[in-house]
Amino acid sequence: PLVKPPKTNGFLPMSRAEMDARGWRELDVLIITGDAYVDHPSFGASMIGRVLEAMGLRVGIVAQPDWTTIESIQEMGTPRLFVGITAGNLDSMLSNYTAARHKRKDDVYSAGGVPGRRPNHASVVYSQMARRAFPGVPVVLGGMEASMRRVAHYDYWEDKLKPSILSLAKAD
């Protein structure tokens, strides 16, 4: 190949035990994603995680956390630099509902295709969770959902204009 791929240490850690196996006491960056963790460049959280890892940062991923409790994102401790948030490869409302506003029967970005593993408006929910779980740590928002809603926009689901997702999510 023209460019030698960076050496990786296996999958990015998803638990305290996996951090301990690497000899890490803390993360530099924690990425929270609405998708299952798939270590492939077609998944943004994995790709960003690998780029940050190649820069020498210690990166962990929390995939599809339980959004009803902040403990689901606190297992690996407070990250040193920031928390990265993405709803996943697809807008969370499109992942959860059809265009006719019916609940989807499956989710192609969840393990086993099981639906309901991400909340509606996942970027906002995960950002608010990160703010409560890690006070003072910057929250960086990215991904498809955040990109499509970065300015004031019409919300089809609520039939009204909504402000930028950055203000709704209180992201940095």
Predicted regions and their residues:
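Conserved glycine-rich "GG(E/T)P / GGGxP" loop and the immediately following alpha-helix
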Residues: T33-D39
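Short secondary-structure capping/turn segments at boundaries of alpha-helices and beta-strands
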Residues: R16-M19, G49, I70-S72
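Glycine-rich beta-alpha loop elements in corrinoid/cobalamin-binding modules
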Residues: A36, G44, A63-D172
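Acidic/glycine-enriched edge-of-secondary-structure segments
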Residues: P1-P6, M55-R58, V108-R118
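Short helix-loop-beta junction
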Residues: M47-V59
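Conserved beta-strand elements of the Class I
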Residues: D28-L30
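Short N-terminal or domain-adjacent regulatory/targeting segments
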Residues: P1-G23
